[in-house]
C-alpha cells in the first residue's frame, strides 16, 4: 500500500472537518472516477462452455501495465481513506494496545528455553533463550537488523539436539520462500551454510547433530518466483559445513509431482518417518527409513491415501499415530512395524464425542488436546490408553502453542479467549501443579467492561452452527450496533476463541464482534470439514448468511450495520457471500481471497487446494466452482455493498491477481455510489511476518472504512 505518516494528526483533523458534509468523499462523485481497467477479449472453453476473462492481463504481475494499474488504484484508495476519521480512532487504539510486551510459549532443548519476545516497539519479535534455573536471557536472533522497514522476517527455527546450533529461516517481504542459515549459539555467529528455495518445510535434525532434513523445490524462473507453480518437492539432508549443492537427495518422486514431504526423526534416533501428503488433503501416506542401516530404502507403512495419520512417537518398533481412520473425531492407534498389516493395528485411545486435534508424548504419558464445542481441553492418558484425568487448566477458550518433549514432565501452553488476553502456563506432570508464568497486558483493555458468549443457530439445512459474540457490556442491543462478522470455513482449520487486538479495537468503538464456526473447518472433526468442502462448499456460504440473519433477528444489528470479514479461504467466503446475499451486509472486507475458482490451480501452490475445492478440469467440479466463483458471479449494473478488497504484491500463496481481477470487474459492475476499493500492500505477502506498523495501518484502514460505512448508512 501507499506510504503514509501514521503520526500525522494534522491530516486527520482536516479530514474530520470535511466529514461534516453528508457527501463525505469530495473526490468521489461518480463511478467514472475509478481508475480505468481495460477489457480484453480473452476466453477459455471449459467442458464446452465459453468463459470470458476480460481482466486476464492483470495476471501478468510485473508488467508495466499492471504496475500502473496498481499505482493508480492505490492512489485512488488512499485519497478515499484519507478522509475517514474513524481510521485514526482505530489506529490510536491499536497503537496503545500494541505498545506493550508480547512473548511466545517457550520450547526446550537441553537446558535452554527458547522464546520470541517483542517489547512493543519492534517491528519483528526477537528470539531469546534462558538457561534452566538462571534468570539471564540471551539474544539469539534479531530480525529487525535484517531490513530497515522490518519486512524480512524470521519464518522458522530448529535447535540441534545438543542445543549448540540453530537452523533458522528468513523470508523476504512476506514470501513463502525460505532461506535457511545456521547459527552457532555459543558464539552468536552464523556459519557459511545457506539453503535456498525451501518452502513449506521445517528443519529436522539427526540426533548426532551432524545435519538436518529439509524440503525444497527447483529454482523458479527469474522474474516468476512469486507465481510459478510449485511441484516436485524433494527431501534433502544437509550436512553442517557443506554447500547446498552437496546436499544428499533423500527422497523424491518425479512420477508424483504433487507429493510433498514432512520428515520426523524418531526420539530414539533410529527412524526417519515421512509424512507423504498431496496438497492440502488431510489424508496422507506414511513411509519410514531405518537410519544408520546399510539399506537406505524407504518402507511404505501406509501406502494408500485413505485417512490422516500423524506420527506421535514410538517405543521400539511400535509406532503411535493420531488418525481419523474410521473415527471422524480422531483416535490414537499403535502399529507394530514388524507386523504392520491393518488387522494387527491396536487402538490405544478410542474416538470420543468431541474433536481430537493433537496428541503429544510427555514423561511417559499421552497428552490429548480436544475441542469441545470449540473450547480446549487437555486429557492425560497412560501409554496403554488408560485415562488418568482431565487437566485442571483454564476453560472456555483456546489452548495454543503446546510445547513439551517425550522425556520431559514440563508442559507449556498459552490460553486466551475473545475477552481474555494471552496467558502462558507451565504444567508440571510430576506434581500436577499449574503455574502462570506470563500474562499479556493490553493498555486500554479492561476485561470487566466486556462480555462474550457462545450461541448456536440453525443454518439453511437445519444444522446447528456455533458462534461467539463479544462486545462491551454497556452497549444496548437495539439492532443499531456496528457488527463485524468473521468467518473462514475450510481446510479442516478450526477458528478458535483467541484474544485479538483488532477485535478489541472494534469493540472499543462500540461494535459487536461475531465469529461463526462454519462447516468446512475442523471444530467438530473430519465430518464437519467434509460438510463444507468440494460439492458441499455452498453449505459454508449458507452458514455465514444464516449467522448474519440470526444476529439481525436477535437484536445485535441489522443489514445496513453489518460488515463481513475473511482472509484467504475466508476472502473467498466474503466474496461469494456479498454476491449471493448483498441484502444482508452494509460493507464487506475480503482479504487475500481466492476469487477466480477456475484458475486458482494455475499459480504457485494453488493446485494443492483441489482437495477442498475440486478441479475446474473435472466437469462435475467445474459446475460447482463456476456457480460460486466470486470473479465469475459479479452481475453488471448491480448495487453491491461498500467493499474494501485487500491484498499484497508479494503474496505467493494466493497470488494478488485474484483480487486485482475481482476489483476491476466489481468496479465495472457497480451501479450505485457505494465504493469498491482495493488496497494493495507492498513488501508484504499472505500475512505471516508482516511488520507491526504495516499491521496497524492495515487494520486501521479496514475497520475505519467499515465503521464509517456502517455509521453513515
Model-predicted segments: where are they?
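Beta-propeller folds
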Residues: 14-19, 23-410, 416-422, 427, ...
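Extracellular/periplasmic ectodomains of large secreted or surface enzymes and adhesion receptors
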Residues: 341, 382-384, 389, 403-409, ...
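Active-site-proximal cap/loop segments of hydrolase catalytic domains
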Residues: 515-713
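Short hydrophobic segments within beta-strands
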Residues: 116, 322, 369, 414, ...
Amino acid at each position: 500500500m501507499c506510504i503514509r505518516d501514521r503520526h500525522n494528526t494534522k491530516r486527520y483533523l482536516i479530514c474530520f472537518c470535511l466529514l461534516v458534509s453528508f457527501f463525505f468523499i469530495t473526490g468521489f462523485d461518480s463511478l467514472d472516477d475509478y481508475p480505468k481497467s481495460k477489457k480484453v477479449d480473452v476466453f477459455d472453453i471449459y467442458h464446452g462452455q465459453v468463459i470470458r476473462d476480460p481482466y486476464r492481463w492483470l495476471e501478468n504481475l510485473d508488467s508495466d501495465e499492471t504496475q500502473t494499474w496498481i499505482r493508480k488504484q492505490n492512489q485512488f484508495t488512499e485519497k478515499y481513506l484519507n478522509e475517514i476519521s474513524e481510521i485514526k480512532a482505530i489506529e490510536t487504539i491499536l497503537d496503545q494496545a500494541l505498545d506493550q510486551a508480547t512473548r511466545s510459549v517457550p520450547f526446550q532443548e537441553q537446558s535452554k528455553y527458547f522464546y520470541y519476545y517483542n517489547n512493543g516497539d519492534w517491528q519483528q519479535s526477537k528470539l531469546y533463550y534462558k538457561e534452566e534455573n538462571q534468570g539471564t536471557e540471551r539474544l539469539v536472533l534479531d530480525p529487525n537488523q535484517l531490513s530497515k522497514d522490518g519486512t524480512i522476517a524470521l519464518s522458522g527455527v530448529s535447535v540441534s539436539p545438543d542445543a549448540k546450533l540453530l537452523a533458522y529461516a528468513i523470508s523476504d517481504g512476506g514470501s513463502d520462500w525460505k532461506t535457511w542459515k545456521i547459527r552457532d549459539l555459543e558464539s552468536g555467529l552464523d556459519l557459511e551454510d545457506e539453503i535456498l528455495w525451501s518452502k513449506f518445510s521445517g528443519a529436522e535434525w539427526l540426533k548426532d547433530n551432524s545435519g538436518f532434513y529439509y524440503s525444497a523445490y527447483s529454482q523458479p524462473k527469474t522474474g516468476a518466483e512469486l507465481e510459478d507453480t510449485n511441484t516436485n518437492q524433494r527431501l534433502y539432508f544437509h550436512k553442517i559445513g557443506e554447500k547446498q549443492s552437496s546436499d544428499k537427495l533423500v527422497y523424491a518422486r518425479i512420477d508424483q509431482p504433487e507429493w510433498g514431504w514432512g520428515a520426523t526423526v524418531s526420539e530414539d534416533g533410529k527412524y526417519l518417518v515421512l509424512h507423504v501428503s498431496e496438497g492440502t488433503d488431510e489424508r496422507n501416506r506414511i513411509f519410514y527409513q531405518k537410519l544408520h542401516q546399510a539399506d537406505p530404502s524407504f518402507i511404505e507403512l501406509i501406502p494408500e491415501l485413505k485417512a490422516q495419520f500423524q506420527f506421535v512417537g514410538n517405543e521400539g518398533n511400535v509406532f503411535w499415530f493420531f488418525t481419523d481412520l474410521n473415527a471422524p473425531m480422531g483416535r490414537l492407534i499403535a502399529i507394530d512395524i514388524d507386523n504392520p498389516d491393518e488387522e494387527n493395528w491396536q487402538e490405544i485411545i478410542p474416538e470420543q464425542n468431541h474433536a481430537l486435534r493433537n496428541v503429544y508424548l510427555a514423561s511417559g504419558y499421552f497428552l490429548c488436546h480436544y475441542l469441545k464445542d470449540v473450547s480446549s481441553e487437555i486429557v492425560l492418558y497412560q501409554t496403554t490408553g488408560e485415562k488418568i484425568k482431565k487437566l485442571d487448566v483454564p476453560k472456555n477458550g483456546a489452548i495454543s502453542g503446546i510445547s513439551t518433549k517425550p522425556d520431559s514432565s514440563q508442559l507449556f501452553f498459552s490460553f486466551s479467549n475473545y475477552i481474555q488476553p494471552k496467558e502462558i502456563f507451565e504444567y508440571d506432570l510430576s506434581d500436577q501443579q499449574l503455574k502462570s508464568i506470563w500474562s499479556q497486558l493490553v493498555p486500554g483493555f479492561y476485561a470487566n467492561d466486556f462480555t462474550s458468549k457462545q450461541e448456536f443457530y440453525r443454518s439453511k439445512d437445519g444444522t446447528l452452527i456455533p458462534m461467539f459474540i463479544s462486545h462491551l457490556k454497556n452497549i444496548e442491543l437495539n439492532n443499531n450496533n456496528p457488527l463485524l462478522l468473521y468467518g473462514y470455513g475450510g481446510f479442516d482449520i478450526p477458528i478458535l476463541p483467541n484474544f485479538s487486538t483488532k477485535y478489541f479495537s472494534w469493540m472499543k468503538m462500540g461494535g459487536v464482534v461475531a465469529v461463526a464456526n462454519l462447516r468446512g473447518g475442523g471444530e467438530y472433526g473430519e465430518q464437519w470439514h467434509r460438510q463444507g468442502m468440494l460439492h458441499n462448499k455452498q453449505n459454508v456460504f449458507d452458514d455465514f448468511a444464516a449467522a448474519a440473519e440470526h444476529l439481525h433477528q436477535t437484536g445485535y444489528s441489522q443489514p445496513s450495520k453489518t460488515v463481513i470479514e475473511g482472509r484467504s479461504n475466508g476472502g473467498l467466503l466474503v466474496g461469494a457471500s456479498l454476491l449471493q446475499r448483498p441484502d444482508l451486509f452494509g460493507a464487506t472486507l475480503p482479504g487475500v481471497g481466492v476469487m477466480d475458482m477456475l484458475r486458482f490451480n494455475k499459480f504457485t501452490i494453488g493446485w494443492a487446494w483441489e482437495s477442498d475445492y475440486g478441479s475446474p478440469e473435472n466437469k462435475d467440479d467445474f459446475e460447482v466452482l463456476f456457480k460460486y466463483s466470486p470473479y465469475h458471479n459479479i452481475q453488471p449494473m448491480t448495487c453491491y455493498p461498500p467493499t474494501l478488497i485487500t491484498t499484497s504484491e508479494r503474496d505467493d500463496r494466493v497470488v494478488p491477481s485474484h483480487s486485482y481481477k475481482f476489483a476491476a470487474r466489481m468496479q465495472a459492475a457497480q451501479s450505485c455510489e457505494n465504493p469498491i476499493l482495493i488496497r494493495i500492500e507492498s513488501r508484504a505477502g499472505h500475512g505471516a511476518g508482516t511488520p507491526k506498523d504495516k499491521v496497524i495501518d492495515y487494520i486501521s484502514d479496514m475497520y475505519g472504512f467499515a465503521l464509517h460505512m456502517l455509521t453513515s448508512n
